[in-house]
Amino acid sequence: MSKQIQIPDIGSDEVTVTEVMVNVGDTISVDQSIINVEGDKASMEVPAPEAGVVKEILVKVGDKVSTGTPMLVLEAAGAAPAADEPTAPVADAPTAPVVATAPTASAIVEVNVPDIGGDEVNVTEIMVAVGDTITEEQSLITVEGDKASMEVPAPFGGVVKEILVKSGDKVSTGSLIMRFEVLGAAPAESASAPASTSAPQTAAPATTAQAPQAAAPDTTAQAPQAAAPDTTAQAAQSNNNVSGLSQEQVEASTGYAHATPVIRRLAREFGVNLDKVKGTGRKGRIVKEDIEAYVKTAVKAYESGATAQATGNGVANGAGLGLLPWPKVDFSKFGEIEEVELSRINKISGANLHRNWVIIPHVTHFDKADITDLEAFRKEQNALREKQKLGVKITPVVFIMKAVAKALEAYPRFNSSITEDAQRLILKKYINIGVAVDTPNGLVVPVFKNVNKKGIIELSRELMEVSKKAREGKLTASDMQGGCFTISSLGGIGTTHFAPIVNAPEVAILGVSKSSMEPVWNGKEFAPRLILPMSLSFDHRVIDGADGARFISYLGSVLADLRRLVM
C-alpha cells in the first residue's frame, strides 16, 4: 500500500530543499533522514515517519516547501506494489522532473530554469561552455538564493549551442538559460523544451520539459517581456505608457542602467526611471527589491507632501526623502583601495535594520544595575552543581531573562506589537524572549518560549542546548519565531553602553554591556559593587519616555534583589 509522506510541522515559513538523501527504490527505516531543508539562517534534516520503500520522490533540490508539502510516496515494507502504478513520473506531476524521450529529428531546444520556487536567485557559476556535449542531469549552472545554493541540471542531453545567462544574473522559474542542439529531437518551433515522458513524438510542440512553461508555450513571442538575453531591444522599448510618479521619476533613462529585461519591464509598469535607482545586486545590478524600495519611498514622500530635492540614486541616496544625494567619491584618488561585495546576510539584515531604524522612532534609556549579590549567588550555585556533576552552568543571561519576564508582566505595554496601520496595539498574553547569539555564520536570535513559567535551571539547560544548535547551524524556523522582546548581550566582549535597534514587530530591546566593579556610596562609605550597564531602546509610538524609565528602573531593582522574582 502506497502512502504519501508530507513535510512535518517546521513552522509557517517556506524553506528550500538543499539535498534529497534517498532514491527511488531505496528501503528506508523510521527516522532515517529523507531530505535536507534550509530556511533563513537555519537548516534541518527531515526524517521518515515510517519505514518502507521509496516509490516516488515529489521534490527536488531547489524546491520551496512548507509544512504539509508532499515530498515522496512510500510503499509500506512487505506491501504488494499496485498493478497500475506508473513506472515514470507523469507529465502533470507538479514537482517531478520531466525528461525528454525518443526524439525524432535534430533540433535546437531551449533549456529553462526548473521550478525553484517563487523567488529570484543569483547565477553564481556557469559550469559548461558553448560546444560542450552534455548528458542528462549534468549540472549546467549554480544559483544562489537566500542562504541556499543549488546546481541546475540538464533536463536532457545535447550540445550547448548558446549560453544566455552569465554570473550575476537574476533568474527565476522558467527563465531561459541555454539552447541545446539535441540529436534526434523533434523541431522546436518556439521556446518549447523537450517533450514529457508521455507521447514524446506527438506532444512535443505542446508539452514542455518544465511545468512553468506549460502555461505559456509560445515564449518566443513573449521574449521582450521575459528574462531573455536581448537586453538591447528590451532597453529600447518606449516608456510612453508610464504614469503615477513625478516627471523627474518617469522621464526616459538617458544612460545605461544595469538591469535585466524583466526588471526594465517592472520599472516601466511602476513608471520608474532606472537612472534614479541604485542597484544593490551583483556589480550594481538593479533587482526587484530596489524598484520596490524606490517606489515605496516615493509614494511615502508624495503622501506626506514632501518633494524630492535630490537627483541621487534610489533610497540609499535619499531619493524621495528630500535629502541631499549621497556623495560620489573616487576614493582611489587618495590611495589604494579594495572593493568587496557585501555578504548576503549583510544585505538582508542591513535592509531589515535600516527599515526598523527609519520607520520606528527610537528612544534609548541608559541605566545601571547592581548585580553584586546576583553574581555571588550565581557562582555559589555553579560551584554546587559542578560538585554534583549535573552538567548545567548558570550564566548571567538567564537571570536577565527572568528579570525581563518579570518586568514585562509589570509593564505589559512592552509586551506588544503595533498594527500595520499604527492605529491599534496587540497585547500579548505570553512571554517569549529572544536572545541574540553570535555564531560563525552570523548573528541569530533564537526565541525562548514562556520564560515566565520556567525556572533558572530549566532555562540554563535550554540556553546551553539552543546555543549549541545555533553554533552548529541546526536552528529551525520555529526556533526563531514568536518573540516578544529581545536581549542583546555584549557583556562577554566589552563596551559600557550601546543603542540597540528594535527588532520589529517587537517594540523594545535590551542591550547589556560588560559589568565592572565601581565604588558606590552606601550612606557611610564608598563600597565596591559589581555594576551592569543596560541600554533600553523602545518604539516611542507605543511607549512614553516615562514608562521607559520606569521599566528599566524596575528591571534594575529586580536584578539587584533576586527575591523580587518570587513576589
Swiss-Prot record:
Coiled coil: none annotated. It catalyses: N(6)-[(R)-dihydrolipoyl]-L-lysyl-[protein] + acetyl-CoA = N(6)-[(R)-S(8)-acetyldihydrolipoyl]-L-lysyl-[protein] + CoA. Residues 2-75, 108-181 form the Lipoyl-binding domain. CDD domains: lipoyl_domain. It comes from the Bacteria. Its EC number is 2.3.1.12. InterPro entries: 2-oxoA_DH_lipoyl-BS, 2-oxoacid_DH_actylTfrase, 2-oxoacid_DH_E2_comp, AcTrfase_Pyrv_DH_cplx, Biotin_lipoyl, CAT-like_dom_sf, E3-bd_dom_sf, PSBD. It holds the Pfam family Biotin_lipoyl. Its cofactor is (R)-lipoate. Residues 192-238 have a biased composition (Low complexity). One of its GO terms (biological process) is pyruvate decarboxylation to acetyl-CoA. The keyword Hydrolase does not apply. The pyruvate dehydrogenase complex catalyzes the overall conversion of pyruvate to acetyl-CoA and CO(2). It contains multiple copies of three enzymatic components: pyruvate dehydrogenase (E1), dihydrolipoamide acetyltransferase (E2) and lipoamide dehydrogenase (E3). Forms a 24-polypeptide structural core with octahedral symmetry. This is Dihydrolipoyllysine-residue acetyltransferase component of pyruvate dehydrogenase complex. The gene is aceF.
